[in-house]
Amino acid sequence: MEDKNKEKINVVELFGSNVFNDKIMQERLPKKVYKELHKTIDEGKELDPITAEVVAGAMKDWAVEKGATHYTHWFQPLTGFTAEKHDAFITAPHADGTVSMDFSGKELIKGEPDASSFPSGGLRATFEARGYTAWDCTSPAFVREDSAGAILCIPTAFCSYTGEALDQKTPLLRSMQALQTQTLRLIRLFGNTTSRKVTPSVGVEQEYFIVDRQKYLKRKDLIFTGRTLFGAMPPKGQELDDHYFGVIRQRIAGFMKEVNEELWKLGVSAKTQHNEVAPAQHELAPIYAECNVAADHNQIIMETLKQVAERHGLQCLLHEKPFAGVNGSGKHNNWSITTDDGINLLDPGKTPHENVQFLMILTCILRAVDRHADLLRESAADVGNDHRLGANEAPPAIISVFLGEQLEDVLEQLISTGSATHSLKGGKLHTGVKTLPDFAKDATDRNRTSPFAFTGNKFEFRMVGSRDSVAECNVVITTIVAEAFSDACDRLEKAEDFELAVHDLIKEYATEHQRIVFNGNGYSEEWVEEAKRRGLPNINSMVEAIPALVTDKAIQLFGKFGVFTEAELRSRAEIQYEGYSKALNIEARAMIDIASKHIIPAVMRFSRNLAGTVNEIKTAGADVTVPMNMLKDTTALLSQTKLALAKLQEAADQAAAMENGREQAEYYHEVVFKDMEELRVPVDKLEMIVDKEEWPMPSYGDLLFEV
């Protein structure tokens, strides 16, 4: 029965209601100040102190009207999470004991968090504490409401006292500048004189798991590490394919409804929601936005999912592989290039063989991905992602590009004859049912096994881990494409005959880099062998991927476009090695703790009770074969568990004693992780034997199917 008192949501009014967006700025800022601020946002003009002061006052008044008592410089350090420090708007008490609410231009533009307390990879020592946050006016400020009240959040970049980037946003903004410069160079050669601004546009599909919070709190492995370290598969997993796009459960639907409302208030255009492949797995996707805004929005999405879940008695799991035996989670990064006058430069049009500018851009991107496949793979490297990539549930660890039949055919024409004369058409889809409409098919199918796939008017990078910031992969994509555009412009700007030169260059790039194009099954063993024959790198783990950051090629690339200095790259490599080691150390210690304090005692109690049962049956003169065999199996597995536990303890101690860096990370990867897997095997077998009432934590079945 419909609840007539249920509040109806006006999405149009709700959307952006907690965002200091362009509409609010037009209403609250003097025209001159509004224009000056937009010169900074649109053209990169330096913001003068007087303008900043007026903007700060208007922003404070708006936020206070929304109930805000504090503000924070909201930034993204290299921890993988966002960071914030809350400062109240109140001034020092006046002579009469009262206070005012104040917020200055200086407070808007600059903050000073402790840089030594965040990962810096050696860029900052403990005694070198000063760091700065700087307002990113291209990403709107917003008011976040939670149990602490309302807080004005100001998106900022974070750098050290000496100017090195200590965050995800700074290099992303640098890479966007580089792409704009080189793209404008390129499209000017094709006669475009109207576009003044170019930005990468990004839409991020976010996968996640939802479980009951009370059950989650009984799983110390989930609490400590974000994933289950032990767990036998339930009778049913995802093999029936009945969860994907299935009817959303009422409890989950209520959670999703509140998530949408919270995101809409914050200006995040949450568009799509559905069940994913694995039980208890779901996806949320917003409409695309400018790259740096999309990266901020994805952080807001992850925070909102976690906060709203708790309010519903649920727990959101963002780990890439919270459960063995079913699909893990990732995020798809949909990337395109758009101009301020509405042109999508990755739109091939209806006749791509005639769209020379598009073909130049396309072959430049092929060149970029082929030359820097190692960097692209590294941008998705994560300790949790190691469980997914190449495991027939996510793209393979081998970077390749899917173009589809239409564009592959155009490139083959270019390579074989030097020109393309036609484009394949999609035709009509006929269902054979008169009451169903016939409609035009796309010119090509989709390939879910490809890590970097062209999907009509954008590229979809599918390797990113579900917890990770999308800033890192977009820094790489944007910079390597900027380099390819720059190289092309260097050639074309010198050409005496532009038309001839551009056709020759398209053919050259298509020919040189055709090895990166693969439209087949990325999950197959045949592709692994074929990729090896083509000379494509197959980087299977995070530890193997990190060195790509500090090759001469990478240092030259990022240095040329001002995205990273060599010192910044080396610091990020060190941070990643250290982060990998710390994550594995926590997982190993958690396994040791859970096995020692919970699982082994529970199995011993079960064995003692089983032994008593054997004796009672024997006394009664009945057959003890079944309970005796159970007891033998249990004690044998318990012995294996104890041996594996001791082995893991020794390896974890040895790893922890090593100096931080590559060697330690490699030891964790090659020794400690394998010992963890070895311990899990007998424990998961014991779970299938021991009485459920005796087992010390909820099972996979409890977590995945009781939501």
Residue ranges and their predicted role:
Residues 2-34, 48, 130-135, 140-154, ...:
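Catalytic pocket of metal/acid-base enzymes, prominently hydrolases
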Residues 129-318, 327-330, 337-574:
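Glycine-rich, acidic/polar active-site loops that bind/position phosphate-bearing ligands
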Residues 222-223, 298, 320-321, 347-351, ...:
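Composition- and surface-driven signal marking solvent-exposed, interaction-prone regions
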Residues 14-129:
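Active-site core of metal-dependent hydrolases
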Residues 68, 72-74, 297-311, 337, ...:
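Hydrophobic/aromatic-rich, well-ordered segments within soluble, folded domains that form packed cores
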Residues 80-96, 113-116, 121, 219, ...:
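Short linear, low-complexity motifs centered on an aromatic residue
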Residues 506, 511-707:
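C-terminal amphipathic alpha-helical interaction region
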Residues 51, 75, 104, 286, ...:
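Active-site proximal loops enriched in glycine and acidic residues that flank catalytic Cys/His/Asp
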